[in-house]
Amino acid sequence: CGVYETAPGDLLLIPDGVPPPAGDAVPAVDTHASGRPSAQLREWAQQRSAGLEIPVIALEAYAYAARVAEVENPKCHIAWTTLAGIGQVESHHGTYRGARLAPNGDVSPPIRGVRLDGSGGTLRIVDTEEAVTDGDGVTRAMGPMQFIPETWRLYGVDAHNDGRVSPDNIDDAALAAAGYLCWRGKDLGTPRGWITA
């Protein structure tokens, strides 16, 4: 374990193994490729998918997002393993409750979290957009990376060039998660940077 002082008198305990290992190196990609750019990593993902128990489409999305982050924010050091860990915890890589990943990365049916209405230990998060609520202003986390609608509006991106920015697409969601975690120059290659991200 490591102990870091975040402010005078405030200590942050960081367990061993943080940040997690970066995993296998990801091949270089053309971040401006047309179509679904993450598909450039098909062979790499197919070689690892079964052993990692991560669908090929999801693994492509995580690795591509980490590669784009490396280009756009080289000091962030986000690894595809971090994105894969989030994807596993939040939605079993887009397969929670029988959802499936389409070849273009869309998750169907859409994955929604519990109502964030303040009950059962949840925060109460109100949103005025009817499309992301049940009509009562209370929201749910969305998609394979479980974005809160307000966060999605700030960080959502079209990672696979279809003209849509969708939290229900694993490519869009993985790249948005990388952008969110790398925000404000965070360095996820350090224990403190990773734990505070």
How does the language model describe each region?
Residues 1-52:
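N-terminal low-complexity, Pro/Thr-rich disordered segments
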Residues 34, 41-197:
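Catalytic glycan-binding domains that act on GlcNAc-containing polysaccharides
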